[in-house]
Amino acid sequence: FYDSPHVYDDLIFPDFWSWVCFTIDSLIQSGTDFWIKPHPNQIALSDTVVQLLIKKYPQLKIMSSRITNSQLVEGGMVCGVTAYGTVAHELAYMGVPSICCAKHPHHSFKFCRTAKSLDEYRIFLQNPSFREQSTKEMQRQALAFFYMHNINGGEDIIALRQQFNRYFKLANDSQGDQLAQELIKFR
């Protein structure tokens, strides 16, 4: 909830709170059985937001963020919903499509349906089990996406990504001294 909601263009909501409330309201109205899985790497402040959601929607079913995507798929998950998260290609690799609502890194791939308006997003949510592709094709596209997004680009790009990931983990999980030492490496 404290991430940058407009890091990608065309997010059809002003912020993540509006997105999650619209999503929950639409799924409830359509009678769709769903669960909320908090982001596994969310910052501690987001726990407060989850508690606010539980107060607003007492019937809400929240699962542990420790549940893996593999466990969800093995349990019968038919669709994932994310504003623009990596879960879209992670689920696609396991044969599960997703619904997104911003121009995100996956938008050129057919393993996720990307809504361009609130009405289109609501329609997608009313039919979450719709699949345009076979599991094999979704898996192929997920691998193509992963290569283009994470591997293609050379050693310098990969090293920068790894350094940023280390910084992010320290910024959210450590004491200031370790973070300062890690930041010095960016000089």
Walk through the language-model features, giving the residues of each.
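Short acidic-hydrophobic, aromatic-tinged amphipathic segments that line or gate anion-handling sites
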Residues: K61-S65, C112-F124
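Conserved catalytic-core segment of nucleotide-activated headgroup transferases in glycan assembly
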Residues: F1-L52
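Nucleotide-activated donor-binding/catalytic signature segment of Leloir-type glycosyltransferases, i.e.
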Residues: V50-S64
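Flexible loop/turn segments at secondary-structure boundaries
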Residues: F1-H6, N41-T48, N69-L72, A88-E90, ...
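C-terminal amphipathic helix plus adjacent low-complexity
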Residues: L118-R187
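A donor-sugar binding/catalytic signature common to diverse glycosyltransferases
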Residues: R66-R113
